[in-house]
Amino acid sequence: MRRIFILNLFFLISFMHFNSAFSISPDVFIQSTVNRASQVLSENITREEKINQLKIIAKETVDIKGVGFYSLGAARKALNDQQKYTYSNLFENYFLKSFSSRLAEYTNPEIEVKDKQILNSNYTIVNSVLIATNERPEVKIDWRVYTKNPDNP
């Protein structure tokens, strides 16, 4: 189960992206996103409300379509436009449900951004750690952030 969670987390973080209109660096973007999710999870609201708010955060920050097509691999080339459209919609629904319901189980997760490595003008790896608690071990998380406009990060 832990392996599946880490694999899903890898796919999520591998395709994080942000709009250049934010004009913030990738590490600040990640910390901001993490803080938003943590705030939702620590609120005294129903699980359903947490799930709905986490879905909004995911839609704003994750390239869900990119994750879906990456998951298809070479099979993507065999699909026609209608099949790609249908798949994208189904994958988005699956991703949002899986991501938000799994994350909603956490209460006040603390993720600390440690470092960043600029790979090129468009990609940055942001290193962070999910702080250990009595219930879960420390988990290292590397986020691959895509900057659409390197001149205005």
Where would I find each of the regions flagged by the language model?
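Surface-exposed, charged secondary-structure patches
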Residues: 97-142
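Boundary at the C-terminal end of the N-terminal hydrophobic targeting segment
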Residues: 21-23
